[in-house]
Amino acid sequence: MEIFITGDTHGDFRRFRPDIFYEQEHMTKEDLVLVCGDFGGIWHGDPRDDAGLDWLEDRPYTTAFVLGNHENYDAYKDYPKEEWHGGQIQRIRPSVLHLMRGQVYELNGRKFFTMVGASSHDIQDGILEPGDPDFEEKFQQLEQRGALFRVNHRSWWAEELPSEAEYLEARANLERVHWNVDYIISHCCPSSIQNVFSGGIFKKDALTEFFDEVRQKCTFRYWFFGHYHSNMVIEKKYAMLFEQIIRLK
């Protein structure tokens, strides 16, 4: 099994074209490409998403992804869950898989811990409620100002951060493997690692603090994450990915 990892796609899958990602020539459905959040392939939750998902299904490999903050969480609620390599997934297409929050998967003899989500940093000017009687007026005013805002259940979802039950499930699954995995796949990263490259621009939250707990308690080889739209290695074992596609050895 070959495993490749990349960063945010936001529904734009051009990096996986055969003339760009040429390694796929020798890949099969047993091989994986993992996306570290902000997958964006299910944004509308209706047939408008089908072209991109069908294109991924036509690739010779299997696409797997965790969710980020720019995702339509409502659109995932109707997909059934199933067990896959020791953890829970949602099968979007036969070979397009959502790797769920707080799961541990065993792939090719290696353990992967996945944790979904991140805080949106483009909501400084607020989150509008579609049911607000003044919604249209407020929306137009914010648009004209070029404000950074989102609309609840249209472009922002509270589920971008885990619930208490999901944190408990994540800890229980890590306990089950004695806090010992090979790789961690997430969208954002621990608060302490965030501080190294951002100088405090990105603020800590419950998820990044949980990741610091994982960092301290868990034995792992590498931690791969997206979210920050750059490619960078921090302290040798934390790999920030955006458009780069790397191969696990």
Predicted regions and their residues:
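Active-site-proximal beta-strand elements of phosphoester/diester hydrolases
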Residues: 1-10, 109-118, 185-187, 239-242
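Acidic, histidine-bearing metal-coordination/catalytic regions of metal-dependent phosphoesterases
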Residues: 1-15, 134-135, 146
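Core catalytic region of metal-dependent phosphoesterases/phosphodiesterases
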Residues: 6, 12-107, 200-212, 216, ...
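Catalytic metal-binding/acid-base residues of hydrolase active sites
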Residues: 9-10, 39-40, 69-72, 118-119, ...
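Generic domain-boundary/flexible-linker signal
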Residues: 14, 44, 74, 123, ...
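Residue-level detector of alpha-helical segments with a strong bias toward transmembrane helices
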Residues: 17-18, 48, 78, 119, ...
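Active-site-proximal loop/helix segment associated with metal-binding centers of metalloenzymes
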Residues: 110-201
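Internal alpha/beta domain cores that form substrate/cofactor-binding pockets in large enzymes
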Residues: 161-249
